[in-house]
């Protein structure tokens, strides 16, 4: 996705510790046209797979996930990082550690919304170590559903996440692959190569 890659290069802010801040279009302020293109790209990858549900984790995965679900014309389900008092039914649950926040969250989805009949695409805003996507995959497995693939908006290719997902047998589609975050600069995979 050339437009996404351009936005990451132009508007992304590199923070010490291998963190990329993209709050101007993805995880604080959202560019809906860009998120629509993200959803459309993921839809085109999995459109013949009988998708019945799009799954993400709150909060930054919701925008790309809902646009993906819109294209599929299926529900978007997001795992909650805390159990609200209104969630009184049985849930699937797992623990997910956030690389960026260095915090572990106990996440849940209602058993009413995820079943063995579902064919799921998992969406996440970032892929670093793969914890969020693997945690969501764990929820899919608990339900007996099928995970058709994982759509990632921004992948930090210099970290182990993608390999961990591939090792788990998952199909991974990354729309913007980052090779390095050095000296305040974003380097994309394939940049500078002949």
From Swiss-Prot:
The coding gene here is: xpt
> Which amino acids does the record list as binding 5-phospho-alpha-D-ribose 1-diphosphate?
128-132
HAMAP family per the UniProt record, alphabetical: XPRTase
Name its GO BP terms in alphabetical order: purine ribonucleoside salvage; xanthine metabolic process; XMP salvage
Kindly give the PANTHER family that the UniProt entry links to this protein. Answer: HYPOXANTHINE/GUANINE PHOSPHORIBOSYLTRANSFERASE (PTHR43864), XANTHINE PHOSPHORIBOSYLTRANSFERASE (PTHR43864:SF1)
The name of this protein is: Xanthine phosphoribosyltransferase
What EC designation does it have? 2.4.2.22
What family, per the record? Belongs to the purine/pyrimidine phosphoribosyltransferase family. Xpt subfamily.
Q: Indicate where this protein resides in the cell.
A: Cytoplasm
């Amino acid at each position: 996705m050339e437009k996404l890659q351009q936005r990451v290069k132009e508007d992304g802010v590199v923070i010490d510790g291998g963190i990329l801040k993209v709050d101007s279009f993805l995880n604080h302020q959202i560019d809906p046209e860009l998120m629509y293109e993200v959803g459309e790209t993921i839809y085109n990858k999995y459109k013949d797979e009988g998708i019945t549900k799009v799954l993400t984790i709150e909060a930054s995965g919701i925008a790309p996930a809902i646009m993906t679900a819109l294209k599929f014309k299926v529900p978007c389900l997001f795992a909650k990082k805390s159990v609200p008092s209104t969630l009184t039914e049985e849930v699937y649950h797992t623990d997910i550690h956030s690389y960026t926040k260095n915090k572990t969250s106990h996440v849940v989805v209602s058993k009413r919304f995820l079943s063995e009949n579902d064919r799921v695409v998992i969406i996440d805003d970032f892929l670093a170590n793969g914890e969020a996507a693997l945690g969501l995959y764990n929820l899919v497995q608990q339900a007996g559903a099928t995970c058709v693939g994982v759509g990632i908006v921004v992948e930090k290719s210099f970290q182990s996440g993608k390999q961990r997902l591939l090792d788990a047998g998952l199909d991974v589609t990354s729309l913007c692959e980052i090779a390095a975050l050095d000296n305040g600069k974003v380097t994309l995979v394939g940049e500078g190569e002949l």
